[in-house]
Structures are given as C-alpha cells and as structure tokens.
A protein has these predicted regions:
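A structural signal for multi-pass alpha-helical bundles of membrane permease subunits
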Residues: 4-283
Length: 283
C-alpha cells in the first residue's frame, strides 16, 4: 500500500514538473513562433485585428523584398567575415592563455589568475571609451578591426577559465612523455593537449560564434558606413524615417539571420553540453 502511494506521488510529481516545463517552453518559444508566422504574412494580415497566429495567405514577399531592399546580402557577408575571424581568434587565443596558466607556474600565477577572474565582473561599458579612443588614434574606427582584434588578445576570461579547468584535468605525464620524445612546448600544446580538449573547444566555438554573430553594441559603436554594417545593425534599416516599421520584412530578415546560429547550435549541441559539463566537473 505504501509502495503504491509512493509511486502515485512520484507520478503526480512528474506530471506537475513536465506541465510546468512545457508551459515555460511555450512561453519562451511563442515570440519565435510569432516571428516565423509574421515573416510569411502580408502587410494587411499583420495589422489585422484580432491578430491570428497563422497567416491567411502565406507569402515569400517579405523575404524577397527584405533581402533586396536593404542590400541584406552585404550585411550577411560582413557578419560572416567578422564572426569567422573573431571566433577563430577566440578559440585560439583563449586556449593558448589557458595553456600558460595550467602548465607554467610562477609566483605571480595565482595573482594573475585572480585578476583574470576579476575581469569577468567588469562591465564592458567601463572600458568602452578608452578602447574607442585607442582605436580612433590608430585609425581603425569604421573598420572591422575593433570587432576582431580583442578576440585575438585572450578571447575572454570565461573561455580561458573553461580551458584551464580542462587542461588541469589532463595528467602532466602526457607533457613529460612528449618532451622525452623530443617535442617542444608548442608541439605538446598543439599535438597532445588540443586534441584532448575538443569538447571544450567546440563549446567555446559555439559561444563565440553566437556572441559575435548577434553582437549589436560593438558594431553600432565602431562602424559608421552602412556598407560595413553587420546583420544586427542592418536590421534597423527596416525602420522608416517617420517611425513606421516594415515589420514583415524585419521579421523575415531576423529569421534569416537566426538560421546559421540555430544550425550550428543544433549540430554541435551534444558537444557543447559535454564541454561545459566536463569543464565544470574536472580540474
């Protein structure tokens, strides 16, 4: 009798849990579903009252006009270039810095590591003005360099921390055995340790790709010429001078801009979760 009541209690608990999770998922996904629906609607259908979730006459006009009207292909290309270079820089530089922290010890290592972690609590807006003045004096404003260079100079404290945690979990005997065979520190890093941290590399790659692709603030600050805008900034072209917004075209191009990120995350989701999990458990 007691066993049956326990099973019933567990069943009820699971039903309640799944109900809450499903409801939360619907709430989170509804704006995305509405965006997809709006991108296929005609203008008259978008402003119809009461609003409907399904388009009355599905059309691809918003995609065609949005892509041609705002020269969205140029924005897409700019985002692809910046995201590719910045993502590669993030993965490379953060892994190199983490290798130094994990394998080369000195008296200053703990202090430097605490300073590194402290930068995670520093808002990016604090260093915005000094960085802007630096790039301005170097003649790099209105170029892609301010969006790319920081990724090659450390790659972010959180990414470095993930790599450090995983590097520390690898036995140093691997390094010593490779050095006995004649490998130098760079060869140990590239041929021995990096292949062993692929899950973390993919996790950092996905996070960096999503961040750089969706970044709106930095391109808005550093880019002035419309032909150099990225997708995030280019979406503002669908706002008219009188405040009127071409909602259908904006939703269509927002959906197009999300497609690469969703594809990468769906493809690498397994490795992304594995990398985060292993970095948290090891070290």
């Amino acid at each position: 009798m007691r066993t049956r009541s326990q099973k019933q209690a567990k069943l009820i608990g699971r039903i309640i849990t799944y109900t809450i999770l499903i409801a939360a998922a619907i709430v989170c996904l509804f704006p995305f579903i509405w965006m997809i629906s709006t991108s296929f609607k005609e203008t008259s259908d978008i402003y119809k009252m009461p609003p409907s979730l399904l388009p009355a006459n599905p059309t691809l006009e918003n995609f065609i006009e949005g892509w041609k009207g705002a020269d969205f292909g140029m924005f897409f290309q700019n985002s692809a270039v910046v995201t590719f270079l910045a993502t590669i820089g993030t993965v490379f530089s953060s892994s190199v810095v983490a290798y130094g922290f994990a394998r080369f010890k000195s008296r200053l290592s703990p202090v430097l590591f605490m300073i590194l972690l402290g930068t995670m609590m520093l808002p990016s807006q604090v260093t915005l003005i000094p960085q802007y003045l630096l790039y301005y004096k170097l003649g790099m404003v209105d170029t892609f360099w301010p969006l790319i260079i920081p990724s090659w100079l450390g790659g972010g404290a959180f990414n470095i921390f993930l790599f450090i945690q995983f590097f520390r979990s690898l036995p140093k005997e691997l390094d010593e055995a490779a050095k006995i065979d004649g490998a130098n520190s760079w060869q140990v890093f590239t041929k021995i340790l990096l292949p062993a941290v692929k899950p973390v590399m993919l996790a950092v790659l996905v996070m960096a790709l999503v961040y750089n692709w969706n970044d709106f603030f930095n391109p808005l600050i550093y880019l002035n010429s419309s032909e150099k805008f990225t997708i995030a900034v280019g979406l503002q072209f669908f706002k008219g001078s009188q405040g009127n917004v071409q909602i259908g075209q904006m939703m269509a191009m927002a959906l197009v801009s999300l497609t690469p990120v969703l594809f990468v995350f769906a493809t690498c989701q397994k490795y992304f979760i594995q990398g985060i999990k292993m970095s948290g458990l090891k070290g």
